[in-house]
Amino acid sequence: MRFVTPVSLALALALTGGAVSAPAFAAKKEEKKAGPKLNVSPDVIKALQAAQKAAEAQDFAGAKAALAEADSKAQSNDDKYQIGAIKLNTSIGAKDAALQGEALTQMLDSGLTPPEQAGQFNAIAADQALQAKNYDLAIQRGQAAVAAGYKAEAVQPTIAQAYFGKAGTTNTSAEPARGFTQQGLTALKAAADAMKAAGQQVPAQWYQIGVGRAEGAKLPDVTEWAKMAYQAEPSGQNLRTLVRLFQRANPNISNRENLDVLRLLGASDGLVVAGDFTEYAEMASKTGIYGEVKSVIDKGRAKGVLNASAGADLYSTAVPKIAGDKGSLGSAEADAQKAANGKIAAATADAYLGYGDYAKAISMFDLAKQKGGVDADEINTRLGIAKTLAGDTAGAKAAFEAVQAGSRKQVAGLWIAYLGTKGA
């Protein structure tokens, strides 16, 4: 897949700065004034004069024939550089990309390209090598462009694509493809960082490519790429990808932790397929949050994602319990106030959270923290969720940041990433 970049390096030099300085060979005095000081062979000068004259007359076939003659007579790097310079200007007039690539290679390989042009020339040569699937040359030229100080945001994507080209698309989790992918991701990250430093917006597609490549190569930084993809384009689908990667990397999280992860999908429109809704309902059912079982299945049915039978067993089990459960909450609040620890308050807060009564949930979670004897990280996570859903993003962020350790801290980090898209 080609990257979408702000400026295509495949543009002709005529569009990015014009022709290079090349004398007309009318006199040796003129020759010494322009570009590097060269000692060009007389036979080469004669052929290049013919090439320039033909190009000025728009006779590009004749110009190319004269350039071929010059090539056959070249004896030194001075000759090769000057032939390349005339060849480059001819390629611009003829709109001949192949000739342009040949010219750039000739000039760069001569070792005489002026420093102020070396970066741009190497960058364009790198892109042309990439188009030709000469990945090693593309990397070599691209790295030379970066070393010459050329725009990293323009060159690093070419280097990244070349490494991805070397990695291929099959068996990318094995070496050497895995290593090439890692190098490509390093270049892609450098490109994104350079674009940000230049005040430009990084194409969201870059992060999606990063996720796909890291996932295919089974690299541990796939989660970091998914997080960057979500921050660049905070859609429910991108957050869903991030959540699913977290779940896969943490297969032993508890049902209660998993419920809080799935709540994030619910809050962000990240519930997409039937399995998302039924998994959420199942986790709520296993932890006795009956109101949430009903609400998530109702939501899936309203969206047309769940049919009448999907999750029906969970639904039919939970709904009859709701009235009695709600009716007991008042006395549970009173008991929580009198209890020696925060366990009753925490359970009551869980129920209120499931029924969407966020104000009472927040009050009970605060009470549970005050009384103690509970899992502080879980309480802070759920307090953050309640505050998020109540619209208190600053308070929610503070609660999530109070989560200290383990997979709970990672769950809180996912919620913080979500809040970051809300201006928190």
Kindly label every feature range from the protein language model.
Residues 40-49, 77-85, 114-124, 133, ...:
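Generic helix N-cap/helix-start motif at coil->alpha-helix transitions
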Residues 341-424:
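C-terminal soluble interaction/assembly domains
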Residues 2-106, 110-120, 124, 131, ...:
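N-terminal leader/linker segments that initiate helical-solenoid repeat arrays
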Residues 3-7, 16-38, 253-257, 270-327:
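Long, contiguous interaction/recruitment modules in multidomain scaffold/adaptor proteins
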Residues 296, 300-303, 309, 313, ...:
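Flexible, glycine-rich surface segments
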Residues 66-69, 97-109, 135-146, 172-194, ...:
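Alpha-helical repeat scaffolds
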Residues 54, 87, 91, 122, ...:
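Residue at a conserved register position within TPR or TPR-like alpha-solenoid repeats
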Residues 57, 94, 132, 166-167, ...:
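Structural motif corresponding to the intra-repeat A-B loop/turn of tetratricopeptide repeats
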